[in-house]
């Protein structure tokens, strides 16, 4: 049963771990794509800036050549001054653009740092999730083991209750058999009583008729009376024997009923007397019964307590 309980737990663990890894992989792919896009933008801007710088250098070189050629003329000087001003303006613009690029580079570096922090946080979260899943699996294994132990205990108790129920049903069958036998014995006893009464009436009638009989028939009457007395004694012995059988049968039935009551109070419903006595007895009798049984039910532990 432990192998059957561990397989679904391992499957749940693998599914949970695979789903978490897929989510982390998707997050990493998104972050990598964002980084690549930002780096591409940065490269494009750097290339544009380099082209502009080259163009400006070319213009500066051309202007320098023009300045070298037009040093003699004032107009050329004015133009040169004008060109210088333009060059200064272009240099300012270049400085502004370089400052913007530096700001964008700083922003990109901050974004890269944040992405690295997020990636490290994701890995730490994955480690924490693995620890939590391990703890959950251990708790589930412990609960499963406890449930299997409780199921085994319940099965043992169920088997015990079934055996007790079988014994109780056997007792009930025996009681039904004995009750039938008791009814048959009572029927036979009634029949024998009726026969005894009839024989007594016949003997009385014979005694009454014997008073009018001749003296020669006295011997026959005495023998007949002796025979009747012996039969009556035999019937009395049979009655006493049947009474004894009936008494033993009742004792056995009482013992079986007492055993059934003890079994019921011990295993099925120990609070039967507590539930039934208030319904059967009155309050006064219950109080008197409580007063009588209280000294026997309490434990005398005063001598065992420390002073």
Swiss-Prot record:
Keywords associated with the record: Coiled coil, Membrane, Transmembrane, Transmembrane helix
Coiled coil: 17-207
InterPro entries, A to Z: SMCO2/5
TM region(s), chain numbering: 243-265
Taxonomy, superkingdom: Eukaryota
Membrane topology: Single-pass membrane protein
CC annotations in GO: membrane
Location of the protein in the cell: Membrane
Family designation: Belongs to the TMCO5 family.
Cited PANTHER family: TRANSMEMBRANE AND COILED-COIL DOMAIN-CONTAINING PROTEIN 5B, TRANSMEMBRANE AND COILED-COIL DOMAIN-CONTAINING PROTEIN 5B-RELATED
Name of this chain's protein: Transmembrane and coiled-coil domain-containing protein 5B
Primary gene name: TMCO5B
């Amino acid at each position: 049963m432990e192998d059957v309980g561990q397989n679904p737990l391992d499957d749940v663990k693998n599914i949970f771990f695979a789903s978490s890894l897929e989510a982390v992989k998707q997050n990493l792919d998104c972050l990598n794509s964002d980084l690549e896009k930002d780096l591409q933008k940065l490269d494009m801007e750097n290339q544009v800036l380099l082209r502009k710088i080259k163009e400006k250098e070319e213009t500066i070189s051309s202007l320098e050549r023009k300045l070298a050629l037009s040093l003699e003329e004032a107009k050329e000087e004015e133009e040169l001054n004008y060109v210088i001003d333009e060059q200064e303006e272009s240099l300012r613009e270049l400085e502004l653009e370089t400052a913007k690029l530096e700001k964008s580079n700083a922003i990109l570096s901050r974004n890269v740092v944040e992405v690295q922090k997020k990636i490290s946080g994701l890995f730490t979260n994955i480690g924490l999730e693995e620890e939590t899943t391990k703890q959950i699996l251990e708790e589930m294994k412990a609960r499963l083991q406890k449930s299997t132990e409780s199921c085994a205990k319940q099965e043992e108790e169920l088997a015990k209750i079934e055996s007790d129920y079988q014994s109780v049903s056997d007792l009930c069958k025996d009681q039904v058999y004995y009750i039938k036998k008791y009814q048959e014995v009572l029927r036979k006893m009634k029949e024998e009583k009726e026969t005894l009464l009839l024989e007594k009436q016949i003997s009385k009638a014979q005694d009454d008729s014997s008073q009018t009989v001749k003296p020669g028939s006295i011997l026959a009457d005495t023998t007949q009376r002796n025979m009747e007395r012996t039969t009556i004694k035999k019937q009395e012995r049979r009655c006493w024997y049947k009474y004894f059988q009936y008494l033993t049968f009742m004792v056995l039935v009482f013992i079986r009923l007492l055993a059934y009551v003890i079994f019921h109070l011990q295993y099925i419903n120990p609070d039967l007397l507590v539930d039934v006595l208030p319904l059967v007895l009155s309050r006064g009798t219950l109080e008197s019964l409580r007063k009588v049984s209280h000294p026997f039910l309490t434990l005398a532990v005063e001598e065992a307590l420390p002073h």
